[in-house]
C-alpha cells in the first residue's frame, strides 16, 4: 500500500462534498502487467484528509503477452583437415617453421562466430621432431594446434584412421601438447592416459552452452591396420557397438543433447554405405540427436532418421568432405574432393525445456590450391568466383573442375539444404 497526501482547502460555505473516482490504470513492463485498484478521494471544508490507494498484493502475468524467445545456440562443424605434402609445403616458412593460419584465413570469421565449433583433425599433430609428412603416414607441426585455436575451433576430433600414423609417440605428443598448451579446448578420440577414456570409465565430454549441456563423442572405424600399443588399448576411440551404446546412454543421462562424430563410410563415395546405415541405426536406438560424419573425403547427403521403436528423431550429416586437401589423384572424380561442407545446426529449448534443433543446413566450402607460399586455403562457395576456380591448380588433375561443377555437385548431394548466406 502507498499513501498520497493532498492538502486541499475548499471554502464551500460549510458544505462538505465527497467525490469517488474509479480508474483502471494498466502498466506494462516486459511481460509483467499490473492494474491499480479504485482510488477514493474525500474533501471537506477547512479540513485535510489523507487519500489512500491500494495496489494488488500480487502482480499477475498477462495472458495476452507472448513469452520471451528461448535463447538459440549455433553449432558448426567442418570436415577433414587433410595435410597432403603440398599443403604442408605451402605453410613452410623461410626459417623452417610452419604457420598454418593461411588455411583458415577466409573462413575463420564464421568459425569464430559460432557458439560451438568442431573440426575433424584428420592427421596427427606429433611435432617436427617426428618429421613433417604427408600421405600415406601424415604428421603435422605443433603450430597447427595454434592455428586451429586461432581460427576459433572449440572441439578437435582426432579419432581418424590416421591417428596412429606416427605410432605411440605421435599420439602421446599430440595429446600432451593439447593438454599443456590449450586446456580449454575439448580434444576427442585419442588418449595418452586412461583417465580420459570412456572405455576406462570416464564420462563423455560435456560442453555447456548457456543452460544447455551438450555431450560430444568421436569414434573411428579403424587405424589403417596399425595396432594400438599393448599397454594403451584405450589410445583411440574405435567404433565398438557395446562401448558406443554405453557411451551414448551415459551421455543421455548427463546431457540435454548428444552429438556423435563418427569417422566412417567409403572414401570418394557420394552416398552412404551399408556400414554407415548400420551405425546410424545404433546411434538412433540409443538416443543420439545429431551425427556429424567424416572420412569419405567427399560430401554425402543429410537426412533425418527415426528410430522405429522409440520414434526418436536424429539428424545425420553422413560426410562433410574435406575442409582442406591437395590430393595427388588425377582424373574423373578428383574435383569432388575439393568440395566440403560446414554443418550449421541451431539449438534451442522447447516449451517443455527440452533441447531441440531449431534450424539446420550446410555451407559449401572449396579447397583452393596453388603453388607457392600460402598457396593453399579454403573459401566458402558463395565467395568463390569463376576466376578463382580457373586459377585452382586442381584443374591440372581434373579438367572438369569449375565453379559450376561445384554448384552442381552441391545440388546433386544436398538439394535445397545447402546455404549460401
Where are the predicted features?
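C-terminal motif of bacterial Sec signal peptides marking the signal peptidase cleavage site
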Residues: 12-14
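N-terminal, intrinsically disordered, polar/charged segments of Gram-positive cell-envelope systems
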Residues: 18-74, 93, 100-101
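Positively charged n-region of N-terminal signal peptides that target proteins for export
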Residues: 1-4
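Acidic, metal/ion-coordinating pockets
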Residues: 57-421
Amino acid at each position: 500500500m502507498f499513501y498520497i497526501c493532498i492538502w486541499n482547502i475548499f471554502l464551500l460555505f460549510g458544505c462538505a462534498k465527497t467525490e469517488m473516482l474509479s480508474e483502471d490504470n494498466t502498466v506494462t513492463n516486459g511481460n509483467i502487467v499490473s492494474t491499480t485498484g479504485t482510488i477514493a478521494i474525500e474533501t471537506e471544508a477547512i479540513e485535510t484528509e489523507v487519500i489512500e490507494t491500494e495496489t494488488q498484493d500480487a502482480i499477475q502475468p498477462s495472458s495476452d503477452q507472448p513469452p520471451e524467445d528461448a535463447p538459440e545456440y549455433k553449432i558448426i562443424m567442418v570436415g577433414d583437415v587433410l595435410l597432403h605434402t603440398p599443403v604442408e609445403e605451402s605453410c613452410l616458412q623461410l626459417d623452417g617453421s610452419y604457420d598454418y593460419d593461411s588455411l583458415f584465413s577466409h573462413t575463420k570469421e564464421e568459425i569464430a562466430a559460432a557458439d560451438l565449433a568442431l573440426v575433424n583433425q584428420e592427421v596427427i599433430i606429433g611435432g617436427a621432431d617426428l618429421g613433417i609428412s604427408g600421405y600415406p603416414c601424415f604428421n603435422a607441426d605443433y603450430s597447427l594446434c595454434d592455428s586451429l585455436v586461432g581460427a576459433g575451433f572449440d572441439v578437435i576430433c582426432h579419432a581418424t584412421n590416421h591417428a596412429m600414423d606416427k605410432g605411440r609417440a605421435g599420439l602421446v605428443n599430440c595429446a600432451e601438447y593439447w593438454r599443456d598448451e590449450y586446456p580449454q579446448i575439448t580434444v576427442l578420440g585419442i588418449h595418452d592416459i586412461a583417465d580420459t577414456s570412456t572405455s576406462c570409465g570416464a564420462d563423455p565430454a560435456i560442453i555447456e552452452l548457456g543452460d544447455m549441456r551438450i555431450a560430444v563423442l568421436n569414434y573411428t572405424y579403424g587405424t589403417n591396420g596399425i595396432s594400438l600399443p599393448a599397454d594403451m588399448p584405450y589410445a583411440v576411440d574405435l567404433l565398438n557397438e557395446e562401448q558406443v551404446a554405453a557411451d551414448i546412454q551415459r551421455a543421455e543421462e548427463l546431457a540435454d543433447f548428444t552429438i556423435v562424430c563418427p569417422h566412417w563410410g567409403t572414401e570418394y563415395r557420394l552416398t552412404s554405405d551399408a556400414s554407415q546405415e548400420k551405425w546410424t541405426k545404433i546411434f538412433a536406438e540409443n538416443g543420439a540427436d545429431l551425427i556429424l560424419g567424416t572420412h569419405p573425403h567427399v560430401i554425402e547427403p543429410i537426412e533425418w532418421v527415426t528410430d522405429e521403436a522409440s520414434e526418436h528423431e536424429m539428424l545425420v550429416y553422413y560426410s562433410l568432405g574435406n575442409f582442406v586437401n591437395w590430393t595427388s589423384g588425377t582424373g574423373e572424380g578428383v574435383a569432388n574432393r575439393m568440395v566440403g561442407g560446414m554443418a550449421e545446426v541451431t539449438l534451442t529449448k522447447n516449451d517443455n525445456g527440452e533441447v531441440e534443433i531449431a534450424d539446420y543446413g550446410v555451407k559449401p566450402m572449396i579447397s583452393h590450391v596453388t603453388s607457392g607460399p600460402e598457396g593453399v586455403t579454403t573459401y566458402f562457395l558463395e565467395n568463390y568466383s569463376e576466376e578463382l576456380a580457373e586459377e585452382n591448380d586442381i584443374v591440372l588433375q581434373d579438367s572438369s573442375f569449375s565453379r559450376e561443377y561445384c554448384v552442381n555437385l552441391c545440388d546433386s548431394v544436398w538439394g535445397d539444404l545447402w546455404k549460401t548466406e
